[in-house]
Amino acid sequence: MAKNGTGGMGGSFLGKVLAGGVASVLCLIAGSAAAEVQTVRFARQLGLGYLQLYVAQDLKLVEKHAKEAGLGDVTAAYTPLGSPSAVNDALLSGSAEFAAAGIPPFLILWDKTRKSADVRALATLNSQPAYLNTNKPDVKSLADFTEKDRIAVPTVKLSYQAIILQMAAEKQFGEGNYAKLDNLTVSLSHPEATISLLSGKTEVSASFTSPPFQYQQLESDKVHRVINSYDVLGGPGSFSALWTTAKFRENNPKTTKAVLAAMDEASAFIKENPKQAAEIYIRLDNSKLAPEFVEKIITDPEIQYSTTPQNILKYTDFMARVGTLKNKPATWQELFFPELHDRAGS
């Protein structure tokens, strides 16, 4: 009796210890998952350069990969913004966890935050040409612009288009003359610039934009192309990227990997389903463009949707040389988080 009683007490005590240990482990596991954010907010610019984010939003790909990673029900929210400066402000103010814009705005933020927020890119989004279009028949090259002209870019001196214009100006006017046309630039979102250029009734006589807006502009017989960014770069190069802070990645490792997986899946979806991707873009953007028109752009061989960087150092070499960047990366990996380092980037 006594033996059985003692054994019962011991078994009960041991059971409680084991149960408590298991409960503690479960709490730790649950706590680890709960420690990561339950809402992931994306601030992005406008246009087909960010098509993966449109697709991820519509197909709930971030939510899918977060759940597969054991994070439970995570919500992804997407906010379109008209300029890269607004996108970067959203990230730094804590209004967004991820920012998506052109490569040069990312590089400038990387340069400025190396000893603070330590912003780096998680992935690129696509490689696509950007066109400088004009409604002035007599403008055949950059040398034909006058002081009366105004060139619309998303953000002066900061946006992808503004930096490419500087690179083109140096090629046109000689080394050191990269800022020769800066005084002609004005900040306008792509939709606003397109409306202004097509109307012909504003000071804007040229628009440096991106797909689909540049092709929409060229539908008018009064508009023609002056330069193509690929000609300036000497070939294709990444146009846009997705970035965040080192702190967010450190505190949310599973979420970060889920976002990258979502972008990879969205890239594959676009390649395999361009028609559906075009329909998603039109619906989410409330665009009046024809689905066939957008699909034709998406399937243009010049445009590639990929999370792997392409010719990133062409931007950094120029921007460091002219003083826009104080720090010049030796490799593209310095600009990206380790999740991307084993890919065949450039």
Q: Which ranges hold each PLM region?
A:
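Soluble non-cytosolic domains of exported or imported proteins
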Residues: 81-85, 100, 155, 159-163, ...
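Pocket-lining segment of extracytoplasmic ligand-binding domains
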Residues: 174, 182, 191-283
